[in-house]
Amino acid sequence: VRFLLVSKEGDGLGIARRLVDEGHDVVATIKDHRVKGDYDGLINKIPKLDLSIPKETIIFFDSSGGGKTAERLRGQGYSVAFGSVFADQLELDRATALGLMEEAGIQVPPSQHFTDWPSGIQHAEAHQGRLCFKSDNNKITSYVSSGPEDMVEFLRTQEKNGKPADFELQEFVKGLEISTELWFDGYDYARPLNHTFEKKQLMNDDIGPSSGCAGNVVWACMEEQCRVCEEGIKRMVPILRHHQYVGMIDLNSIVNEEGVWGLEFTPRTGYDAFPALLDMLTDELGDLIARYARGDRSPKFPIREKGFGAGIRVTIPPYPFVDVDAPKGIAIRNLVRADRAHSYFYNVFLDDEGQLRSSGAFGAIAVFTSFGDDIFSSIAKCEEIAKRVDLKDRQYRTDLGSVFEKQYREFKDAIQIRPPQDVQPSLSLVG
């Protein structure tokens, strides 16, 4: 099968390489000039989307923002997986996404949208509790304050640095944070769903800057026993069906004694838990993408129903800071053949001598993945690869096994389903 990846920042290049390993003919086009050198020598690339490509090509998108292009390609007769105007709206317009959650009967924390820094600063100064900052269009990393003073300082820093003001300030909700994902075929979702725990801070004990994702663990969700499913993402089904949504969608939520609180959606393949999910698939990835591109009904999601997939991100400085390019040409050695199947690479290339090297850009090298019967064993396998690799100035966390095991115990105590509530979502916001 011939595949074409349309990528914004190269997040889906690991998917493209997986398809090559499965024997498919794959090409990719990348929009962001900073990562144009990623995967040189690993996959074939074209400078821009070529509409003369054969109609039998399966096209897939890895990020938000390309919805109009994806829908235009579908209208021209191409089979396109993922990417839609509705998906863009869900991720890039947080106010609308939160409104849709409320319409679906999902409770959300009080939130306010701002398009200028002074108004946001004034709001934070008047607020007595903790706040969460979330940028529309994903231009600035999310931030959770420890109190009103540091949120004011954070906002003033963004203003001084000339960052675009388009953001939400959301009241902090204490509880256990978890992501729940379903794959939707336009009518219904495939079973089982899956859950993800994620840690963002770069260093052990949640110290240091937020890195987007330092590591995660994924497992299949038995929905009949889970409040997150019943009170959370399953309530979105009528809205997803109304929009004939096709692809994966992830609800990030907080679970506490008051129930499930919806925070945000992630409707794209280039999300941080996808590498770990790959280790749990029981079908080839190419078959899975092709089914959703063709619009086939997909009642069964091909994932192991017992055990845990895991991923640990390995980076080099100045990651996670992107204002300065990471060094280019650092060798990545000591990866044995078996490791390659559990290595989801990012800012790397293969030189003329066959040596894998850093490509510069952001300094994200790879997520090393694994599958195990329990959380400790799955994380331990990831750490074995991370320890073995020879990479100058590598950075990764070493405490995720114990951290995620503790979270999992807390989660099992928190997910018992409450008495059913009759919630019928209105469709006033989905037309």
Predicted regions and their residues:
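ATP-binding N-terminal substructure of ATP-dependent carboxylate-amine bond-forming enzymes
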Residues: 1-86
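A conserved helix-loop-beta module that forms one wall/lid of the active-site cleft
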Residues: 83-144, 148-149
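Short arginine-rich
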Residues: 162, 384-400
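Active-site "cap" helix and flanking loop/linker of ATP-utilizing ligase/carboxylase catalytic domains
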Residues: 229-249, 266-340, 350-353
